[in-house]
């Protein structure tokens, strides 16, 4: 069942494109990109979410990430 978002597809796609452009402009390899994005997620959670909710938000984020990963071996 698809999730309903309060953000438009255009908002999401534009931000995704801009973040991708930054990583590409720095020629960041996959491992560095994942490390930086992971640190960004951690910083967002620690600075913007109440301490009592952080574990639940992190768990929900991790579950959403795992469910969005495609097991297809083709890129």
Curated annotation (Swiss-Prot):
What top-level branch of life does the organism fall under? Answer: Bacteria
Detail the disulphide connectivity of this chain as listed in its UniProt entry. Answer: none
Q: Which NCBIfam families match?
A: PRK13689.1
- Which family, according to the similarity comment? Belongs to the UPF0352 family.
Q: What is this protein called?
A: UPF0352 protein KPN78578_25810
Q: Which organism is it from?
A: Klebsiella pneumoniae subsp. pneumoniae (strain ATCC 700721 / MGH 78578)
């Amino acid at each position: 069942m698809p999730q309903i978002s309060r953000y438009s597809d255009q908002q999401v796609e534009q931000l995704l494109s801009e973040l991708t452009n930054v990583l590409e402009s720095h020629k960041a390899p996959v491992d560095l990109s994942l490390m930086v994005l992971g640190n960004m997620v951690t910083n967002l959670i620690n600075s913007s979410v109440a301490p009592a909710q952080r574990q639940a938000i992190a768990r929900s984020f991790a579950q959403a990430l795992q469910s969005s990963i495609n097991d297809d071996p083709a890129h």
